[in-house]
């Protein structure tokens, strides 16, 4: 994993807070104390204040709002607890006649500093109480002793639930009642995470020796094939390092065992009974893609149902409590039933403008367990034709062509890793393998020149995707259309090189309606256009094959004008100077297909 971060002239934490307030009209910044507060004073409700070391964004400042979450958040330096002075400033900035609830994660520095601020507030006659969030299950009861569990992503749920309760029930809610309820919420939370590496900390002008972590030891960077379970959000070591990296399905199964096992008495912090309502939170630790995050959620939900008979009544997936750029995720479960408050789901569903609570769903009434629906039926009509072709020759040409493409996949992938996004070889191989499969299963009507091309279009469109898939699909579909039009105007006929050459020209013109790329633009057109033009002129497949090959090779000297290759720096191309330059991967792939078809044609005794 890269250890690089951008460099900042100004204080990173303060710049972050300023940026947050610039983009959110509902909050203000006490710059000298690094405190973000709600722009509205609501002294008729219990105020909620939280905070801690920076690096866990959007927690905590991203949860400050006017409508039912935090009223203030205090930011320390990265992974370092804020000072008591800062915290006390937040308390004074958001006074309340009904009192202030201070929520902290269970780390020694936070408890000491926030606790002292609470005591100072009480000494001045203010009503203030401290609630400590602890939801980690990775460290068992025997080891954590008097320290308790670490505070992790469950803190986000605590903020949301208690913030909404204080807002919605402000007229009838007392501080001691909110504290008692908060303790029940915390007692019914469990969280565990997994990561591919420890996080990297940006350089900063204001370094501090202490941090929020209670870990007295350093950490070792994980090896490239290693992962870790139970890693803390301040780089604290977890409970297990292992190699090789498992599938997410296997990893999720292990993580859920830590959360839900009834036989592991050391970690059985929360009991989940059959009819309990359970809330699930999938949290991005900072470096996990959104694509992966929802896939992880899907796997978690499936395993909760199949192995534990748990169907979460609410699912929240996103970036809530991070560890800078941590390449991992955490799973949090809340037993909503055992908190004893029938309105707890209403608190979770309450709409908020806080940017840190990144779930905009407040109405769950339309939720269904089976969310899969059938695709609409599309009547594509009968593509059958009276355009005949020798089925054996056709099969041989297809098989030889796609096998040649598959053999070139590693080289095409290498080229595209530099010139594009690295998927060209795999995309072409996917389409080729799908055609081989269709041939093996007899799914192509190879006696019908038009119907078979329509079938191949469907296969290519489904298997390939991307730009290549689109170009191939349009061209093959247009080729089928041209062959069909000839039948409609002239009647039944058998494919010959001459009829094919005319339809290839028509197909190329159709393709040109959808792409501005032409020969010389360093795309697959550099192989396709010369092939079609030479074939139309000479009706000689060998000459046309050579034209395609020469066109593809010529791209080694061309400047890219289309696609991702057009953005690549010139120095990236230098590693291929020994072979004449870096060619366009798509052109090389198409030339391989044409070459394979040509080889098979001249080996066959049957000719068109």
Curated annotation (Swiss-Prot):
It catalyses: dihydroxyacetone + ATP = dihydroxyacetone phosphate + ADP + H(+); D-glyceraldehyde + ATP = D-glyceraldehyde 3-phosphate + ADP + H(+). The keyword Isomerase does not apply. SUPFAM superfamilies: DAK1/DegV-like (SSF82549), DhaL-like (SSF101473). The keyword Cytoplasm applies. Its main location: cytoplasm. Keywords: ATP-binding, Cytoplasm, Glycerol metabolism, Kinase, Nucleotide-binding, Transferase. Gene3D superfamilies: 1.25.40.340, Dihydroxyacetone kinase, domain 1 (3.40.50.10440), Dihydroxyacetone kinase, domain 2 (3.30.1180.20). Its EC number is 2.7.1.28, 2.7.1.29. Residues 8-357 form the DhaK domain. The active site is at 234 (tele-hemiaminal-histidine intermediate). GO terms for molecular function: ATP binding; glycerone kinase activity; triokinase activity. Residues 392-599 form the DhaL domain. It is found in: Cytoplasm. Substrate binds at residues 53-56, 105, 110. Pathway: Polyol metabolism; glycerol fermentation; glycerone phosphate from glycerol (oxidative route): step 2/2. It comes from the Eukaryota. ATP binds at residues 421-424, 467-468, 523-524, 584-586. One of its GO terms (cellular component) is cytosol. SMART domains: Dak2. InterPro entries: DhaK_ATP, DhaK_dom, DhaL_dom, DhaL_dom_sf, Dihydroxyacetone_Kinase. GO terms for biological process: anaerobic glycerol catabolic process. It is an enzyme of class 2 (transferase). Belongs to the dihydroxyacetone kinase (DAK) family. Catalyzes both the phosphorylation of dihydroxyacetone and of glyceraldehyde. PANTHER family: TRIOKINASE/FMN CYCLASE, TRIOKINASE_FMN CYCLASE. This is Dihydroxyacetone kinase. It comes from Komagataella pastoris. The lineage of its organism: Eukaryota, Fungi, Dikarya, Ascomycota, Saccharomycotina.
């Amino acid at each position: 994993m890269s250890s690089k971060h951008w460099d900042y002239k100004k204080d990173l934490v303060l710049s972050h807070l300023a940026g947050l307030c610039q983009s959110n009209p509902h909050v203000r910044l006490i710059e000298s104390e690094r405190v973000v507060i709600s722009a509205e004073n609501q002294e008729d409700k219990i105020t909620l204040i939280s905070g801690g070391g920076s690096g866990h964004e959007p927690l905590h400042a991203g949860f400050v709002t006017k409508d039912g979450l935090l009223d203030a958040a205090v930011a320390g330096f990265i992974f370092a607890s804020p000072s008591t002075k800062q915290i006390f400033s937040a308390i004074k900035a958001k006074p309340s006649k009904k009192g202030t609830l201070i929520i902290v994660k269970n780390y020694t520095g936070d408890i000491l500093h926030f606790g002292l601020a609470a005591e100072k507030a009480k000494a001045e006659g203010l009503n203030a109480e401290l609630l400590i969030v602890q939801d980690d299950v990775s460290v068992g009861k025997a080891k954590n002793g008097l320290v308790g569990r670490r505070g992790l992503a469950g803190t986000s749920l605590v903020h949301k639930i208690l913030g909404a309760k204080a807002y919605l029930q402000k007229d009838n809610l007392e501080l001691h009642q909110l504290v008692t309820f908060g303790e029940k919420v915390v007692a019914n939370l469990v969280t565990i995470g997994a990561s591919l590496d420890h996080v990297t900390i940006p350089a900063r002008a204001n370094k501090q020796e202490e941090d929020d972590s209670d870990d007295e030891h350093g950490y070792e960077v994980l090896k490239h094939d290693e992962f870790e379970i139970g890693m803390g959000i301040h780089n604290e070591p977890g409970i297990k390092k292992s190699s090789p990296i498992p599938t997410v399905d296997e990893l999720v199964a292990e993580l859920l065992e830590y959360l839900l096992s009834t036989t592991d008495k050391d970690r059985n912090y929360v009991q989940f009974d059959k009819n309990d309502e359970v809330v699930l939170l999938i949290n991005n630790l900072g470096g996990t893609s959104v694509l992966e995050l929802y896939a992880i959620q899907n796997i978690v939900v499936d395993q909760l149902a199949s192995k534990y008979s748990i169907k979460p009544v609410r699912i929240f997936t996103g970036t809530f409590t991070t560890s800078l750029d941590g390449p991992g995720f955490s799973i949090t479960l809340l037993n909503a039933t055992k908190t004893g408050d029938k309105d707890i789901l209403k608190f979770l569903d309450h709409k908020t403008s806080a940017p840190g609570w990144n779930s905009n769903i407040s109405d769950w009434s339309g939720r269904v367990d089976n969310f899969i629906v059938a695709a609409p039926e599309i009547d594509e009509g009968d593509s059958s034709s009276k355009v005949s072709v020798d089925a054996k020759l056709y099969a041989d040409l297809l098989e030889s062509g796609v096998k040649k493409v598959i053999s070139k996949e590693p080289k095409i992938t290498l080229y595209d890793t530099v010139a594009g996004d690295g998927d060209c070889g795999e995309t072409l191989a996917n389409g080729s393998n799908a055609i081989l499969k269709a041939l093996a299963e007899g799914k192509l009507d190879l006696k019908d020149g038009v119907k078979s091309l329509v079938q191949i279009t469907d296969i290519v469109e489904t298997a390939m995707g991307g730009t290549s898939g689109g170009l191939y699909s349009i061209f093959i579909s247009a080729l089928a259309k041209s062959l069909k039009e000839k039948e409609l105007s002239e009647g039944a006929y058998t494919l010959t090189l001459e009829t094919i050459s005319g339809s290839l020209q028509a197909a190329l013109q159709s393709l040109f309606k959808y792409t501005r790329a032409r020969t010389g633009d360093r795309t697959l057109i550099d192989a396709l256009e010369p092939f079609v033009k030479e074939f139309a002129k000479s009706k000689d497949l060998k000459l046309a094959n050579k034209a395609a090959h020469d066109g593809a090779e010529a791209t080694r000297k061309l400047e890219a004008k289309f696609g991702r290759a057009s953005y690549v720096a010139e120095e990236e191309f230098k590693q291929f100077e020994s072979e004449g330059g870096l060619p366009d991967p798509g052109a090389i792939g198409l030339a391989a297909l044409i070459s394979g078809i040509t080889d098979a044609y001249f080996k066959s005794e049957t000719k068109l």
